[in-house]
Curated annotation (Swiss-Prot):
GO terms for molecular function: ATP binding; ATP hydrolysis activity; proton-transporting ATP synthase activity, rotational mechanism. Pfam families: ATP-synt_ab, ATP-synt_ab_N, ATP-synt_VA_C. F-type ATPases have 2 components, CF(1) - the catalytic core - and CF(0) - the membrane proton channel. CF(1) has five subunits: alpha(3), beta(3), gamma(1), delta(1), epsilon(1). CF(0) has four main subunits: a(1), b(1), b'(1) and c(9-12). It comes from the Eukaryota. HAMAP family: ATP_synth_beta_bact. Its EC number is 7.1.2.2. Keywords: ATP synthesis, ATP-binding, CF(1), Chloroplast, Hydrogen ion transport, Ion transport, Membrane, Nucleotide-binding, Plastid, Thylakoid, Translocase, Transport. It is a peripheral membrane protein. Belongs to the ATPase alpha/beta chains family. This is ATP synthase subunit beta, chloroplastic. It is found in: Plastid, Chloroplast thylakoid membrane. Produces ATP from ADP in the presence of a proton gradient across the membrane. The catalytic sites are hosted primarily by the beta subunits.
Length: 498
């Protein structure tokens, strides 16, 4: 952890001058610390416990002050395991909140909640640090213009467009392509917007975090040969870590993203996986801090904690942070306080469907379940809005007819319904797209499709101009011209076979 960026050896030369306290009580990950009268630390100050455990091994535990209890005592939450700590151990008040490294040197690296690199690649080459607790940008700094954040992914841009500086909820189970979609977005923002990404793994499985890192190296999102060319910084606070680390790792990732937005004036993508674990960690700590639980056992400060994180994710006149947050819904209950509080902050939802993944349609984004507040004629324009609505109507009608088709077959449908089904199947396939990050697995080159090209393609399918083309011509292509070229190739291949 960096305490003071002005010293050559951060966190050492300044510590001797700081206030010293003693551990008075240990309740799991929560410590009570007694300080001399008049030397009390401020709330959110970082405290460091240095000493030796009962086995004689050196210990270095960082804590964060949460409450001032009176009688010269404070209550703090530990950011690492408290095993081996004993009453009476010396505690150093650093006089400042937790600070983490920021800037270009963080790209391609993995950090823990304290901003310490955990990838065995040596120290981070930066002296610039930033405290993890900051207030949200003032109203006067905000960019109030509603603009679309183009991702180059057809299904997202057309049917559930992302807002620049907005918050998107990503819903999907295991194995439906969440990770690949996240990596493609990281890749596309780097290429199309010259932006960077920060990934915050909040309370996720260690194996998943490791898999993501390996896949990013394989797909080129993290460049092993030249780490500075990487497009993403990773911050992990895994499931096995104490609740203090899981509660604050989201803020560490956000602080790194804010630097790219405010100082480098870039468009930043911030991924949080999983936002529910942030709430869960807060509820674990809340009871230990002596707060009365609220509905369903959650912390009474749930809305405040969520708001303090979400309100910092926004567009300013310098740049933007667009956040994509994986949302776990406990027991599929959308009225649970954790997802319900999250929904209040979201501008769009991207729902991944296991049914589409089973059909081999990737990205497996459900076009009917995914929503966006940006899909309004005054924001996206009349043409975009009308095409999106017609695409949804066609797919909805196809969904309604599927039971009839399953029982009676296509022949029993009216001419109009048969045409609707044919176009819907083409639309469904045209919503698929080859990804850059999947090239190493599929062998197909990735495609970035601009919004205008996307609208033109669906306009041609809906108008009936392409009714004569086979539906497989629309599968895993970029723009509509590639679909017509693929149809010609398929026709030539079938003629040669004859």
């Amino acid at each position: 952890m960096r305490i003071n960026p002005t010293t050559s050896d951060p966190g050492v030369s300044t510590l001797e001058k700081k206030n010293l306290g003693r551990i008075a009580q240990i309740i799991g990950p929560v410590l009570d610390v007694a300080f001399p009268p008049g030397k009390m630390p401020n709330i959110y100050n970082a405290l460091i416990v240095k000493g030796r455990d009962t086995a004689g091994q050196p210990m270095n535990v960082t804590c964060e002050v949460q409450q001032l209890l009176g009688n010269n005592r404070v209550r703090a939450v530990a950011m690492s395991a408290t095993d081996g700590l004993t009453r009476g151990m010396e505690v150093i008040d650093t006089g400042a909140p937790l600070s983490v490294p920021v800037g270009g040197a963080t790209l391609g690296r993995i950090f823990n909640v304290l901003g310490e690199p955990v990838d065995n690649l040596g120290p981070v080459d930066t002296r610039t640090t930033s405290p993890i607790h900051r207030s949200a940008p003032a109203f006067t700094q905000l960019d109030t213009k509603l603009s679309i954040f183009e991702t180059g992914i057809k299904v997202v841009d057309l049917l559930a467009p992302y807002r620049r500086g907005g918050k998107i909820g990503l819903f999907g189970g295991a194995g439906v392509g969440k990770t690949v979609l996240i990596m493609e977005l990281i890749n596309n923002i780097a290429k199309a917007h010259g932006g960077v990404s920060v990934f915050g793994g909040v309370g996720e499985r260690t194996r998943e975090g490791n898999d993501l890192y390996m896949e990013m190296k394989e797909s080129g999102v993290i460049n092993e040969q030249n780490i500075a060319e990487s497009k993403v910084a990773l911050v992990y606070g895994q499931m096995n870590e104490p609740p203090g680390a899981r509660m604050r790792v989201g803020l560490t990732a956000l602080t790194m993203a804010e630097y790219f937005r405010d100082v480098n004036e870039q468009d930043v993508l911030l991924f949080i996986d999983n936002i529910f674990r942030f709430v869960q960690a807060g509820s674990e700590v809340s009871a230990l801090l002596g707060r009365m639980p609220s509905a369903v056992g959650y912390q009474p400060t749930l809305s405040t904690e969520m708001g303090s994180l979400q309100e910092r994710i926004t567009s300013t006149k310098e740049g933007s942070i667009t956040s994509i947050q994986a949302v776990y819904v406990p027991a599929d209950d959308l009225t649970d306080p954790a997802p319900a509080t999250t929904f209040a902050h979201l501008d769009a939802t991207t729902v991944l469907s296991r049914g589409l993944a089973a059909k081999g349609i990737y990205p497996a984004v459900d076009p009917l379940d995914s929503t966006s507040t940006m899909l309004q004629p005054r924001i996206v324009g009349e043409e975009h809005y009308e095409i999106a609505q017609r695409v949804k109507e066609t797919l909805q009608r196809y969904k309604e007819l599927q039971d009839i088709i399953a029982i009676l077959g296509l022949d029993e449908l009216s001419e109009e319904d048969r045409l609707t089904v044919a176009r819907a199947r083409k639309i469904e396939r045209f919503l698929s797209q080859p990804f850059f990050v999947a090239e190493v697995f599929t062998g197909s080159p990735g495609k970035y499709v601009g919004l205008a090209e996307t609208i033109r393609g669906f306009q041609l399918i809906l108008s009936g101009e392409l009714d004569s083309l086979p539906e497989q011509a629309f599968y895993l292509v970029g723009n509509i011209d590639e679909a017509t070229a693929k149809a010609m190739n398929l026709e030539m291949e079938s003629k040669l076979k004859k």
